Amino acid sequence: MVERLRDVSKFANIQDMNWTVSYFNERVQREITEWPVGIYADYLRLILLMEAHGADLRLPHSRAMGDGLFELRCKNVEGIGRAFYCTMIGRKIVILHSFIKKTQETPDRELKTARKRLKEVKHAQ
C-alpha cells in the first residue's frame, strides 16, 4: 500500500518502518535495560515509535539539544530517564548515553559525555 500511495503523490509523507536503533556500546544498552521497569517500558515504547516513524518525535517525547544531539525523554511514576541520541545517514539512530534524572536540570557531566560520544560517532562516519 505504501508503494501505491507513493505512486499517487510524490509528496506523500509516508515513512517505512526501516529505521534502525543501535547503541554507542554494550554498556549504554545494559544501563538502559537496568532502568526501573516502568521507565524502561516507556523507553521501549518511544524506541518503537522512532523505528516506525523516524527520530523526529518532538516534545514531550524528545528534545533537540543542539548540534545534532537529541534527548529521549522517558517518564513514569518511578522516575525520569534520559537517553541521548543522534541520527546517521541511512536511517540510523545511535543511543549515545543514558541516565536516570534526579534533579530538574540535566547535569553538565551527562551532557558532556553525550556530546563527546556524538563527536566520536560523527568523526567515525
Q: For each of these PLM feature ranges, what is it?
A:
Residues A83:
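Portal/gating segments that form or line small-molecule/metal binding sites
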Residues M1-I80, I89-I93, I100-Q125:
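Basic, Lys/Arg-enriched alpha-helical interface segments
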